[in-house]
Structure formats: structure tokens, C-alpha cells
Amino acid sequence: MTVSAQNLVWIDMEMTGLDPEQNVVLEIATIVTDKDLNVLAEGPVIAIHQSDEELAKMDDWNVNTHTNSGLVARVKASQHDEAQAVAETLDFIRQWVPERTSPLCGNSIGQDRRFMVKHMSDLEAFFHYRNVDVSTIKELVRRWQPALLDQFKKSGTHQALDDIRESIAELQFYRSHVFKI
């Protein structure tokens, strides 16, 4: 394992909803890649215990999605709180990148960052202020080369580690088909 400022840290979180003021984090996962998007390591996948009161705030989509994926059961059984999840995630990330060097990478990663600011500020502070947001590229491709979108399909499991793997694969696809780098 080599610490490098060129490595990229990918994070995905599943939440009870979209509003960090009203909702909470259910799960967090992390993957580190090198600058060429080769996976170096998969970090911990942590379900974060939440009270029945917090879980009851979920809308139907979140209840169905997170129940069907098994996440609600994992959250109820989890012994991890947010602080423990942050500590374990940071312990993993520090093995691969210096502080404030990696942009936060993922799909719609600005949403995850909003939840970090509210609920996991120590984790958010570890990252560079920049983001590598794959969904930004997707939105541009949708407008400039829409036929390409049919060539890449995601399974959409809404499980954090799977979502990161798909985000990396999606950026690899755009790199070879859009940027041709």
C-alpha cells in the first residue's frame, strides 16, 4: 500500500432521505483508486445504527428500497454509530491518501458531501474541496452525445459499495468513449 496524493477516494452513502437537516446516514462505503481508476482497495462497508424513530421518517421509496436491499435490517442490527463509522473510514483512507489531497469522488457526490458537512464533519474536512462527480459528466453526455447513454447500464442496487463500483466503471466508460484518454 502506497500513500499518494494522486490516489482518488470514492465514497457512497445511503440515507433515509435527501435532506441532511431532516434525514440521517444509513450506510457508508469507500473505495480507493489510483489516478487511472484502478481499484487499490475497498474500505469498510458500515451500516450505521439508527433509531426506529429515524427510520420511520423515510418515505415509501426509501422504505421499499432499503428494506428490499436488506439495509434496514443491517442498520437495526448494527453496533456502529456515526462517530465510529467516521473513525473507521478515516483510518482506512489515511492508509492511501494524505489529508486534503483527494477530491471526493462518486455519483451525485455533492449530496453525500452535504450529509458529511451536517453529520460527519471530520470526514468531510479530510477531503480536498473539489469533487469528481460522475453524474456531471453523465448530464453533459445526455445533452451532447445522448446515444452513448444506452451503452452503459447500471444495476442501481442502492447498496453503497455496489454503487461505488458502478460509478468507477461509469467513469472508465466515459474516459474511453467521451474523453478518449
Curated annotation (Swiss-Prot):
Cytoplasm keyword on record: yes
Location (main, coarse): cytoplasm
GO molecular function: 3'-5'-RNA exonuclease activity; nucleic acid binding
Superkingdom of the source species: Bacteria
Residues the record marks as active site: 129
Pfam families for the chain: RNase_T (PF00929)
Subcellular location: Cytoplasm
Function, in words: 3'-to-5' exoribonuclease specific for small oligoribonucleotides.
HAMAP family: Oligoribonuclease (MF_00045)
Gene: orn
Disulfide bridges in this chain: none
Protein name per its UniProtKB record: Oligoribonuclease
